[in-house]
A protein has these predicted regions:
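Acidic/His-rich, divalent-metal-binding segments that scaffold phosphate/diphosphate chemistry
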Residues: 1-103
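A general structural-boundary detector
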Residues: 40-43, 109, 127
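Charge-dense, low-complexity intrinsically disordered segments
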Residues: 47-50, 109-113
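Metal-dependent catalytic cores of enzymes that make or break cyclic nucleotides
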Residues: 98-110, 156
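Phosphate-backbone recognition surface of nucleic-acid-processing proteins
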Residues: 112-120
Length: 178
Protein backbone atom coordinates (compact mmCIF):
# COMPACT_ATOMS: atom_id res chain seq x y z
CA UNK A 1 0.00 0.00 0.00
CA UNK A 2 1.04 3.62 -0.40
CA UNK A 3 1.17 3.99 3.39
CA UNK A 4 3.64 1.09 3.71
CA UNK A 5 5.81 2.59 0.97
CA UNK A 6 5.74 5.99 2.69
CA UNK A 7 6.57 4.43 6.07
CA UNK A 8 9.50 2.54 4.51
CA UNK A 9 10.75 5.68 2.78
CA UNK A 10 10.38 7.75 5.96
CA UNK A 11 12.46 5.18 7.85
CA UNK A 12 15.17 5.03 5.17
CA UNK A 13 15.37 8.82 4.85
CA UNK A 14 15.03 9.68 8.55
CA UNK A 15 18.29 11.66 8.38
CA UNK A 16 16.90 13.78 5.53
CA UNK A 17 13.41 14.99 6.54
CA UNK A 18 13.37 17.72 3.88
CA UNK A 19 14.03 15.09 1.21
CA UNK A 20 11.28 12.83 2.52
CA UNK A 21 8.83 15.75 2.60
CA UNK A 22 9.74 16.73 -0.97
CA UNK A 23 9.28 13.16 -2.25
CA UNK A 24 6.03 12.83 -0.34
CA UNK A 25 4.70 16.12 -1.73
CA UNK A 26 5.62 15.01 -5.28
CA UNK A 27 3.81 11.64 -4.90
CA UNK A 28 7.00 9.59 -5.28
CA UNK A 29 5.49 6.59 -3.46
CA UNK A 30 2.41 6.33 -5.68
CA UNK A 31 3.81 7.60 -9.02
CA UNK A 32 3.50 5.01 -11.81
CA UNK A 33 6.64 4.43 -13.86
CA UNK A 34 6.42 5.97 -17.33
CA UNK A 35 7.47 4.01 -20.40
CA UNK A 36 10.85 5.69 -20.78
CA UNK A 37 12.79 3.15 -22.82
CA UNK A 38 11.18 0.91 -25.44
CA UNK A 39 12.96 -2.19 -24.10
CA UNK A 40 12.13 -1.50 -20.47
CA UNK A 41 9.64 -3.59 -18.54
CA UNK A 42 7.91 -0.60 -17.04
CA UNK A 43 5.28 -0.64 -14.34
CA UNK A 44 2.32 1.62 -15.14
CA UNK A 45 0.67 0.79 -11.81
CA UNK A 46 0.60 2.79 -8.59
CA UNK A 47 4.03 2.85 -6.96
CA UNK A 48 5.88 1.79 -10.12
CA UNK A 49 8.55 4.49 -9.79
CA UNK A 50 9.09 3.61 -6.12
CA UNK A 51 9.43 -0.13 -6.83
CA UNK A 52 11.75 0.45 -9.81
CA UNK A 53 13.96 2.84 -7.82
CA UNK A 54 14.07 0.50 -4.83
CA UNK A 55 15.06 -2.40 -7.09
CA UNK A 56 17.91 -0.30 -8.51
CA UNK A 57 19.01 0.52 -4.94
CA UNK A 58 18.93 -3.16 -3.94
CA UNK A 59 20.81 -4.19 -7.08
CA UNK A 60 23.46 -1.54 -6.47
CA UNK A 61 23.78 -2.71 -2.86
CA UNK A 62 24.17 -6.30 -4.09
CA UNK A 63 26.91 -5.24 -6.53
CA UNK A 64 28.56 -3.36 -3.66
CA UNK A 65 28.56 -6.46 -1.48
CA UNK A 66 29.62 -8.97 -4.13
CA UNK A 67 32.27 -6.77 -5.76
CA UNK A 68 33.56 -5.13 -2.57
CA UNK A 69 32.77 -1.65 -3.84
CA UNK A 70 33.52 1.19 -1.46
CA UNK A 71 31.52 4.37 -1.05
CA UNK A 72 32.17 7.67 0.70
CA UNK A 73 28.86 7.21 2.54
CA UNK A 74 27.32 3.89 3.57
CA UNK A 75 23.85 4.96 2.38
CA UNK A 76 25.05 5.88 -1.13
CA UNK A 77 23.69 2.80 -2.96
CA UNK A 78 20.27 3.38 -1.40
CA UNK A 79 20.27 7.12 -2.09
CA UNK A 80 21.48 6.77 -5.67
CA UNK A 81 19.00 4.00 -6.43
CA UNK A 82 16.07 5.87 -4.96
CA UNK A 83 16.97 9.29 -6.35
CA UNK A 84 18.47 8.82 -9.83
CA UNK A 85 15.10 9.05 -11.61
CA UNK A 86 13.59 11.90 -9.58
CA UNK A 87 13.47 13.94 -12.80
CA UNK A 88 10.26 12.01 -13.57
CA UNK A 89 8.53 13.95 -10.78
CA UNK A 90 8.86 17.18 -12.80
CA UNK A 91 7.95 15.65 -16.16
CA UNK A 92 4.86 13.67 -15.13
CA UNK A 93 2.05 13.80 -12.63
CA UNK A 94 -0.51 11.33 -11.29
CA UNK A 95 -4.21 11.57 -12.02
CA UNK A 96 -6.98 9.38 -10.61
CA UNK A 97 -9.10 7.47 -13.11
CA UNK A 98 -11.79 4.83 -13.19
CA UNK A 99 -14.39 4.09 -10.55
CA UNK A 100 -11.86 4.13 -7.75
CA UNK A 101 -9.92 7.25 -6.75
CA UNK A 102 -7.11 4.85 -5.87
CA UNK A 103 -6.42 3.96 -9.50
CA UNK A 104 -3.79 6.29 -10.91
CA UNK A 105 -2.83 7.29 -14.39
CA UNK A 106 0.17 9.24 -15.56
CA UNK A 107 0.09 12.45 -17.58
CA UNK A 108 2.98 14.30 -19.15
CA UNK A 109 3.50 17.68 -17.55
CA UNK A 110 3.23 20.13 -20.44
CA UNK A 111 4.87 22.92 -18.46
CA UNK A 112 7.61 21.42 -16.27
CA UNK A 113 9.54 23.84 -14.10
CA UNK A 114 12.98 22.77 -15.33
CA UNK A 115 14.35 22.09 -18.82
CA UNK A 116 14.50 18.52 -20.13
CA UNK A 117 17.09 16.30 -18.55
CA UNK A 118 17.73 13.10 -16.67
CA UNK A 119 20.50 12.95 -14.10
CA UNK A 120 21.14 16.68 -14.32
CA UNK A 121 17.48 17.42 -13.72
CA UNK A 122 17.39 14.99 -10.79
CA UNK A 123 20.32 16.83 -9.20
CA UNK A 124 18.61 20.20 -9.66
CA UNK A 125 15.44 18.89 -8.00
CA UNK A 126 17.42 17.39 -5.11
CA UNK A 127 19.82 20.21 -4.31
CA UNK A 128 17.54 21.93 -1.78
CA UNK A 129 16.75 18.71 0.05
CA UNK A 130 19.96 16.72 0.55
CA UNK A 131 23.71 17.33 0.45
CA UNK A 132 25.00 14.63 -1.85
CA UNK A 133 28.64 13.58 -2.01
CA UNK A 134 30.51 14.24 -5.25
CA UNK A 135 30.44 10.48 -5.87
CA UNK A 136 26.64 10.38 -5.49
CA UNK A 137 26.26 13.38 -7.78
CA UNK A 138 28.38 11.76 -10.49
CA UNK A 139 26.48 8.47 -10.19
CA UNK A 140 23.13 10.24 -10.52
CA UNK A 141 24.33 12.58 -13.27
CA UNK A 142 25.68 9.75 -15.45
CA UNK A 143 23.27 6.98 -14.43
CA UNK A 144 22.26 6.53 -18.08
CA UNK A 145 25.79 5.41 -18.96
CA UNK A 146 26.25 4.89 -22.69
CA UNK A 147 22.71 6.23 -23.22
CA UNK A 148 24.00 9.64 -22.13
CA UNK A 149 23.95 12.09 -25.05
CA UNK A 150 27.04 11.62 -27.22
CA UNK A 151 28.46 15.09 -26.58
CA UNK A 152 28.79 14.15 -22.89
CA UNK A 153 30.55 10.80 -23.36
CA UNK A 154 34.02 12.22 -22.68
CA UNK A 155 32.76 13.58 -19.35
CA UNK A 156 31.09 10.27 -18.55
CA UNK A 157 34.42 8.48 -19.21
CA UNK A 158 36.26 10.96 -16.97
CA UNK A 159 33.68 10.39 -14.23
CA UNK A 160 34.22 6.61 -14.45
CA UNK A 161 37.99 7.08 -14.23
CA UNK A 162 37.51 9.26 -11.17
CA UNK A 163 35.06 6.85 -9.55
CA UNK A 164 34.26 3.34 -10.76
CA UNK A 165 30.91 3.40 -8.94
CA UNK A 166 29.57 5.59 -11.77
CA UNK A 167 29.90 2.56 -14.06
CA UNK A 168 28.39 0.18 -11.52
CA UNK A 169 25.41 2.48 -11.03
CA UNK A 170 24.64 2.19 -14.72
CA UNK A 171 25.23 -1.57 -14.52
CA UNK A 172 22.67 -1.85 -11.70
CA UNK A 173 20.12 0.15 -13.68
CA UNK A 174 20.64 -1.95 -16.82
CA UNK A 175 20.18 -5.17 -14.88
CA UNK A 176 16.82 -3.86 -13.65
CA UNK A 177 15.44 -2.38 -16.88
CA UNK A 178 16.57 -4.92 -19.47
Amino acid sequence: STKKRKDFLCDQLKNWPSLFNFLNQKDFCCMPLPNIYPTMNYDPTEGGLFFYSLEVARTLQSLTTHMSLTWKREESPLLIGLLHAIWILDDYYCVPFGDSQEQLGLLRNESPIYPPGYGDKSLILLMNHIDLTEEEKLCILYHRGAFTEMQYWKYYCKAIKKNQNVLFTHTAICSVIF
